[in-house]
UniProtKB/Swiss-Prot annotation:
Zn(2+) binds at H79, H238, D242. One of its GO terms (biological process) is lipid A biosynthetic process. It comes from Histophilus somni (strain 129Pt). Gene3D superfamilies: lpxc deacetylase, domain 1, lpxc deacetylase, domain 2. This is UDP-3-O-acyl-N-acetylglucosamine deacetylase. Catalyzes the hydrolysis of UDP-3-O-myristoyl-N-acetylglucosamine to form UDP-3-O-myristoylglucosamine and acetate, the committed step in lipid A biosynthesis. Keywords: Hydrolase, Lipid A biosynthesis, Lipid biosynthesis, Lipid metabolism, Metal-binding, Zinc. One of its GO terms (molecular function) is metal ion binding. Pathway: Glycolipid biosynthesis; lipid IV(A) biosynthesis; lipid IV(A) from (3R)-3-hydroxytetradecanoyl-[acyl-carrier-protein] and UDP-N-acetyl-alpha-D-glucosamine: step 2/6. InterPro entries: Ribosomal_Su5_D2-typ_SF, UDP-acyl_GlcNac_deAcase, UDP-acyl_GlcNac_deAcase_C, UDP-acyl_N-AcGlcN_deAcase_N. Belongs to the LpxC family. PANTHER family: UDP-3-O-ACYL-N-ACETYLGLUCOSAMINE DEACETYLASE 1, MITOCHONDRIAL-RELATED (PTHR33694:SF1). The keyword Lipid biosynthesis applies.
Length: 305
């Protein structure tokens, strides 16, 4: 049986909020089987919880933001969510003492280290997957994203920025998902932004914690980070990281083929909602026999960073 997974123990880290620039403490705690992914604002009295849910995503302007019925929000959840998807964590309580998850280095890699440091524990309950049964496609102008049936989780992402530093050879990335592939190929890819956009955001009191330490920054001609890129196609890899985090907002690893062109948080979320709303397009599946599970979801004995 492929089992649900949680953490062996709680673990805590301190970082900076991307938009506030303030110190944020993040605590990750184990959770019982069938709990799912629960975000919790501990700076509120009483604490406010946000179960990971595609319909709770109500603001995708700059990041993926969960907002409850009372208008309380928790922002920048996508990189941590991607790490949870990457390692197949089904049940976890995520406590944060601020309105946003710390940005860390702008990638999912620090969260991978954190989760592996806490240790991953299998629970004696079958893990549920969402299997895509029929094609679903969402379009917005020339942007689009789609799911198709596939025995595994395949991702194909294309970006299209007219910029001297983003050549045509680094605009597409394709990956057959597995924990190992995610950790090595995707988790280290950092978020990116353009200097003119960042200056505008900061004038509006946003992105105050943004810096060359937690983002790739481009001016009109080049990449400003002294150490350059971690991968030549780091930008499109980060967009794939975002998509993996956005699609895990349903709380279940997906079995299907995801393909996107110029998609962002908003379109990723619309695609996930469209899938879930069409009862004939998907089904829950569990695997009693490890021989039946799609190759990418066979849990490795250990993940090499």
């Amino acid at each position: 049986m492929i089992k649900q997974r949680t953490l062996k123990q709680s673990i805590k880290v301190t970082g900076v909020g991307l938009h506030s620039g303030n110190k944020v403490t993040l605590t990750l705690r184990p959770a019982m089987p069938n709990t799912g992914v629960i975000y919790c604002r501990t700076d509120m009295n009483p604490p406010v919880t946000f179960p990971a849910n595609a319909n709770a995503v109500r603001d995708t302007m700059l990041c993926t933001c969960l907002i409850n019925e009372d208008g309380v929000r928790i922002s920048t959840v996508e990189h941590l969510n991607a790490a949870l998807a990457g390692l197949g964590i089904d049940n976890i309580i995520i406590e944060v003492d601020a309105p946003e998850i710390p940005i860390m280095d702008g990638s999912a890699s620090p969260f991978i280290y954190l989760l592996l440091d806490a240790g991953i524990e299998e629970q004696n309950v079958a893990k549920k997957f969402i299997r895509v049964k029929k094609p679903i496609r969402i379009e917005d102008g020339d942007k689009w994203a789609e799911f198709k049936p596939y025995d595994g989780f395949r991702l194909d992402f294309t970006i299209d920025f007219e910029h001297p530093a983003i050549g045509k050879d680094v605009r597409n990335y394709v990956m057959d998902f597995s924990a190992q592939a995610f950790v090595q190929q995707i988790s280290r890819a950092r978020t990116f932004g353009f200097m003119k956009d960042i200056e505008y955001l900061q004038s509006q009191g946003l992105a105050l914690g943004g810096s060359l330490d937690n983002a790739i920054v481009l001016d009109d001609y080049r990449i400003l980070n002294e150490d350059g890129l971690r991968f030549k196609d780091e930008l499109v890899r980060h967009k794939m990281l975002d998509a993996i985090g956005d699609l895990y907002m349903c709380g279940y690893n997906i079995i299907g083929d995801f393909k996107a062109y110029k998609s962002g948080h908003g379109l990723n979320n619309k695609l996930l909602r469209a899938l879930l709303e069409n009862q004939e397009a998907w089904e829950f599946v569990s695997f009693e026999d490890k021989e039946e599970i799609p190759q990418g979801y066979v849990s490795p004995a250990q993940v090499f960073i």
